[in-house]
Amino acid sequence: MRPWTGSWRWIMLILFAWGTLLFYIGGHLVRDNDRPDHSSRELSKILAKLERLKQQNEDLRRMAESLRIPEGPIDQGPAIGRVRVLEEQLVKAKEQIENYKKQTRNGLGKDHEILRRRIENGAKELWFFLQSELKKLKNLEGNELQRHADEFLLDLGHHERSIMTDLYYLSQTDGAGDWREKEAKDLTELVQRRITYLQNPKDCSKAKKLVCNINKGCGYGCQLHHVVYCFMIAYGTQRTLILESQNWRYATGGWETVFRPVSETCTDRSGISTGHWSGEVKDKNVQVVELPIVDSLHPRPPYLPLAVPEDLADRLVRVHGDPAVWWVSQFVKYLIRPQPWLEKEIEEATRKLGFKHPVIGVHVRRTDKVGTEAAFHPIEEYMVHVEEHFQLLARRMQVDKKRVYLATDDPSLLKEAKTKYPNYFISDNSISWSAGLHNRYTENSLRGVILDIHFLSQADFLVCTFSSQVCRVAYEIMQTLHPDASANFHSLDDIYYFGGQNAHNQIAIYAHQPRTADEIPMEPGDIIGVAGNHWDGYSKGVNRKLGRTGLYPSYKVREKIETVKYPTYPEAEK
């Protein structure tokens, strides 16, 4: 008897199991024909599952083909290993069949439905409360009005935190939290493999290259974003990024003295032809392309933020609240891999500061920004949001101490903050001194800003001004540390943006009729170019259909996710 008989039984059993699963899903679709509304809601999910299962079935088919061995002597070692893999696949197939049956038979879990109803009830009760309290305020005057208004805001905060806490638990129930962790990890590893493949060509002399010079005339956060922009264009045009950083204003030895090289195999910009950027199509036959700063970029390729890869978009929308930020964060993650000495510095600073959770990061940018790019904000304005978030955290964890990491370029601010809010702040004032204008472009200053950004990104929540590049970099890094940290911030001024980005658009989901001359009308489906959120329930933007600029209720729109056909680098998976 041939030794492959048992193996082929396994193979046939596996293929039968997959066929059964595909038949079951198809039958589910047929049975749902008498409920067309339900079917339409579930169709996209089921088709996605079906596509994944088809792919897995194809993988199994290939494995089966690889076991077709001709007559004659047989080396059973590798084959036995393949059979074991197939056995594992069979177990997984059975598990997926059972899980899918449970899902379609029982619907959502009990905890999910309990929380959903609690949130629904909380929203209704909030509305009842608002109506009642506002009616009372109409009949009050003077001190009585002030007292009642203060109590009203206090109670309103309790309502809001209750609903937000329930929403958090809803996001974790029925295995959703575990799924989100795994999906975010899988997506990150996929993108990092693709970047690593692009950056390490087998033959550097033949590789297409994109040259980026780090010495843009601005600070560290701005320069890092400049390199990220270069990297995204390189990734989109399938060119290895060559980062020129000698005589960097922060470290004359270059980027590699602080962070790991962007390539292990290709750092030489030489090639048979070189030219300045003139567009992806025109540069097709140019081996080495030099990229200008984004302000001078023409023509503009589609790969600029806030676009995300078409092949990842559906998965990103499910797992993350701001896919565009997540996509930017992947390039930041690759770029700022620290050299061993920097890793040691970070570990020592963490120990010295006593940095541990829960902790909220506060970044206050003063000096050259105030009066030009940003308004002055007193420390009290930041601390309002710090207190609010600690109260929210206390709903779901033990807050043994309210810790705040303060990062600022104003050395006098830490003393002021500690006087007004004793026992809150864990910070290093020497970093503030190094961030001052007279010390800004030194290696010590670079160490300081890197440490500040690191600790801000590690915080549970971030309070800052998004007009600051440092704050936005910290927020980007934060996205790489959690499945979805898109809501873990409060900006006192701008919404998130990437310098040089393409238009940021939203889509109206509800109609709006202006009540004042400052507002704009909207109809469902209108495209709104957003200029900013006023953090008072209203945003400002332009209705692109009407050409009118003004205010509109923020809840009446949703984000328009822009997708681009980026390369998928299948070679990275081999």
Curated annotation (Swiss-Prot):
Subcellular location: Golgi apparatus, Golgi stack membrane
This protein's UniProt keywords: Disulfide bond, Glycosyltransferase, Golgi apparatus, Membrane, Phosphoprotein, SH3 domain, SH3-binding, Signal-anchor, Transferase, Transmembrane, Transmembrane helix
The record's account of how the chain is modified after translation: Tyrosine phosphorylated by PKDCC/VLK.
Region of interest: Important for donor substrate binding: 365-366
Catalytic activity: N(4)-{beta-D-GlcNAc-(1->2)-alpha-D-Man-(1->3)-[beta-D-GlcNAc-(1->2)-alpha-D-Man-(1->6)]-beta-D-Man-(1->4)-beta-D-GlcNAc-(1->4)-beta-D-GlcNAc}-L-asparaginyl-[protein] + GDP-beta-L-fucose = an N(4)-{beta-D-GlcNAc-(1->2)-alpha-D-Man-(1->3)-[beta-D-GlcNAc-(1->2)-alpha-D-Man-(1->6)]-beta-D-Man-(1->4)-beta-D-GlcNAc-(1->4)-[alpha-L-Fuc-(1->6)]-beta-D-GlcNAc}-L-asparaginyl-[protein] + GDP + H(+)
Pathway: Protein modification; protein glycosylation
Name the record gives this protein: Alpha-(1,6)-fucosyltransferase
Organism this protein belongs to: Pongo abelii (Sumatran orangutan)
Gene: FUT8
